[in-house]
Regions:
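Acidic/polar, low-complexity extended loops/arms that serve as protein-protein interfaces
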Residues: 1-144, 160, 168-172, 178, ...
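Sequence/fold signature of self-assembling virion shell proteins
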Residues: 76, 80-83, 163-291
Length: 291
């Protein structure tokens, strides 16, 4: 979704953006010009946003005996589970309303005002009104193109079976084709069932490594702490309970385990990423849904 970049060895990626909305006074629209007449010179207002690497990481361990005796190999299963679970964590962080900082990017709903959902009498009327409410700000901003719906799969199922009083299912074929009102749909269980989200993906920019970086060690020492999971919903392990083995004051973390001494193996995954919206107000949120 959106425009994707790669950090490579760059510590920051600067992406130009337009400061003024389209059709604002002083924009760069062309004008009809008569023969021999001077062509107008207009000035636009442009700025930039920056993408900087935010590191996701996790470590998991297993014993030497498990490595030697498991079929299929436990390391492969752990790598697969890390990728699956991290994908869910990324979706959760992407779709929340938490502000960004030096540790993590801001969620798409950060700073977005929630539009109250419709209280119409039928499900079809509620769905139609909620979609219209989500779309209206984009129409006002002349930006009602390259949009994508974000919905929970359970809501997509309900839309398929929502019918009019005469037995017509207006959304069934659309959902089956992967769109609503001609706009593509992304279904994710990380979208709350009470939410309908609409994003202008043309303004969504991101940088994510093509593949996670995995490293193996059997000699490291680790502080065995899960970083506050599952209560650390902000995904900021740095603000939770994972500690240096020995801090600046000489205080040792606990519990600490030596992989070499316990004949164990650790798998570490690292993944750099960042995302942002190039223009403000290019995300709308309707909630709480009543269908």
């Amino acid at each position: 979704m959106g425009i994707r970049f790669s950090f490579g060895r760059n510590g920051v990626i600067k992406i130009p953006r337009r400061n003024r909305p389209r059709n604002a006074p002083g924009d760069l629209r062309g004008a009809f010009v008569g023969e021999g007449a001077p062509i107008p010179v207009r000035r636009g207002s442009f700025g930039s946003i920056s993408l900087t690497p935010h590191k996701m990481g996790v470590i998991s361990t297993f014993s030497r005996e498990m490595a030697n005796q498991s079929t299929p190999q436990i390391e492969g299963l752990i790598r697969e589970a890390i990728v699956e679970d991290t994908a869910e964590a990324i979706d959760q962080a992407l779709l929340d309303a938490i502000a960004g900082d030096t540790i993590r990017p801001a969620g798409l709903l950060n700073g977005v005002s929630t539009t109250p959902a419709s209280a119409a009498s039928t499900s079809v009327d509620k769905i139609t009104a909620d979609m219209a409410a989500a779309l209206a700000p984009f129409i006002t901003a002349n930006a009602a193109d390259r949009l994508v719906w974000l919905i929970n799969p359970s809501n997509a199922f309900k839309m398929q079976w929502a019918s009019t009083t005469v037995g017509v299912y207006p959304f069934r074929d659309q959902i089956a084709a992967g769109n609503i009102a001609g706009l593509p749909v992304i279904q994710s269980t990380m979208v709350p069932t009470t939410s309908l989200i609409l994003v202008r993906y043309a303004d969504f920019v991101s940088s994510v490594a093509d593949t996670p970086e995995f490293d193996i060690s059997d000699v490291a020492s680790i502080h065995e702490d899960d970083g506050g999971y599952p209560t650390d919903q902000a995904m900021r392990a740095g603000t939770a309970t994972v500690l240096p083995l020995v801090d600046a004051a000489g205080v040792a973390a606990k519990p600490v385990r030596s992989l070499w001494q316990t004949a164990s193996i650790g798998v570490r995954m690292l993944l750099d990423m960042d995302w942002a919206m190039r223009r403000a107000s290019m995300v709308t949120h309707v909630s709480p849904l009543a269908w």
